[in-house]
């Protein structure tokens, strides 16, 4: 074990003790929660927070939140992207409250739906849209429709991808074979009939899989995000688009996380041309909402294939999809919050965050790397930027992750629990970024022994 690892274990024990001492009320609620909630949390992912129990929140506004023990935090997790808008932006709160008094869900169209569809067309260039409650649903529906109009059974995803809880995407490569992703709960779907997997940025592997001509669609983020940010190599997107077109395979881009690249996502920023596009989380400022869009040609094929009398039992859609409350939140978010001016500020803050972390890494000569995509920043425990999902996965270190997250949390800074990710919101300030930089510098100073514990 390295000296850094040994120090990390010692520091983690100290930080765990400090966390429990400073959060007595959260500890009480965590104990009570075990009597009514599975694993003691409302959604089992929340066990991933770095302490012995999660902090219980009381209120959140802008880029900060306060817990039940009265401690205030700078929030760089922002609901793991759902609150990339900042918590409870005033225009969204106001318009949602007004709409709530007029109706929540009707199973009828609203003018809000038209406005949102038109705005998504303006931003992403796709002329037809549908709505869902979550980005997982949007991805699932897009895959089903791709299978419908192509008559092909399989979806291709990239190794270590993330597209929510879509069964077909919970797969990785092991010795060249497609297997269920580690941690997948229950028996997996029959991956040999549903899924192909290729390494990100590997054009030869992508071509080999697509030439089987049994793939309905490629579902991918424009850049991998959930295993750490993995950028496309120069020319990769051109090759991806050329190969999908030549093999008559639909290309679906999932912009749920990569919306961090700008108001029109990575797609607009880099002029990509998907057949379908999905987006969720932040578009409603954290109110459950998602959308999926189509080119005119794909939309025509879908409309021709869907029977009106059976449309409600076809496996696409849902009772709450397109509800007027969610669409009001999306309209207010797109019109007033996630604007071009806001993204300009958010991306500048992301650059400042990146510089601060990289300077601290360089100052202590650590073999780590920081990567940024728009207003999203992550650091990995490897010396250079990853090229594939496998590169990023191999850099994972649960001990260091937990220590750095807990060290920051104990000093009033919240990072995303699943990886070392930070998001900038319209409400984030330079002082917030600098607070993280100072905490991170202290943490690596203690890890390397250059700062006394």
Residue ranges and their predicted role:
Residues 1-453:
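Conserved N-terminal phosphate-binding loop of PLP-dependent enzymes in the Aspartate aminotransferase
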């Amino acid at each position: 074990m390295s000296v850094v690892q040994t120090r990390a274990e010692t520091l983690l024990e100290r930080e765990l003790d400090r966390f429990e001492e400073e959060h007595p009320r959260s500890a009480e609620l965590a104990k009570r929660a075990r009597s009514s909630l599975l694993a003691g949390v409302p959604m089992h992912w929340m066990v991933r927070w770095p302490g012995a129990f999660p902090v219980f929140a009381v209120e959140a506004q802008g880029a900060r939140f306060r817990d039940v023990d009265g401690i205030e935090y700078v929030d760089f997790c922002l609901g793991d992207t759902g609150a990339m808008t900042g918590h409870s932006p005033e225009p969204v709160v106001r318009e949602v409250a007004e709409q709530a008094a007029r109706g929540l869900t009707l199973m009828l169209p609203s003018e809000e739906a038209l406005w949102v569809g038109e705005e998504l067309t303006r931003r992403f260039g796709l002329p037809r849209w549908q709505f869902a409650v979550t980005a997982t649903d949007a991805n699932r529906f897009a895959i089903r429709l791709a299978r419908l109009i192509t008559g092909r059974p399989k979806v291709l995803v990239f190794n270590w991808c993330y597209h929510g809880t879509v069964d077909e995407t919970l797969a990785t490569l092991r010795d060249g074979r497609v297997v269920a992703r580690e941690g997948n709960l229950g028996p997996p779907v029959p991956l040999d009939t549903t899924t192909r997997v290729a390494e990100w940025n590997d054009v030869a592997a992508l071509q080999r899989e697509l030439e089987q001509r049994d793939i309905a669609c490629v579902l991918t983020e424009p850049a991998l995000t959930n295993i750490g940010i993995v950028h496309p190599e120069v020319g990769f997107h051109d090759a991806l688009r050329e190969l999908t077109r030549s093999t008559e395979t639909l290309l679906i881009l999932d912009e749920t996380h990569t919306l961090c690249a700008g108001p029109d996502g990575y797609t607009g920023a880099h002029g990509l041309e998907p057949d379908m596009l999905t987006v969720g989380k932040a578009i409603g400022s954290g109110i459950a909402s998602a959308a999926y869009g189509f080119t005119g040609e794909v939309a025509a094929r879908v409309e021709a294939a869907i029977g009106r009398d059976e449309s409600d039992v076809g496996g696409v859609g849902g009772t709450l999809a397109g509800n007027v409350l969610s669409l009001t939140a999306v309209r207010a978010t797109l019109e007033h919050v996630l604007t071009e001016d806001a993204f300009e500020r958010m991306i500048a803050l992301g650059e400042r965050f990146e510089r601060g972390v990289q300077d601290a890494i360089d100052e202590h000569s650590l073999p780590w790397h920081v990567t940024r995509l728009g207003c999203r920043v992550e650091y990995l425990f490897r010396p250079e930027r990853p090229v594939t999902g496998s590169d990023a996965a191999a850099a994972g270190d649960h001990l260091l992750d937990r220590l750095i997250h807990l060290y920051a949390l104990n000093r009033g800074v919240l990072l995303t629990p699943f990886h070392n990710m930070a998001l900038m919101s319209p409400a984030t300030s330079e002082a917030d970024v600098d607070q993280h930089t100072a905490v991170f510098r202290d943490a690596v100073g203690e890890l390397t022994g250059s700062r006394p514990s």
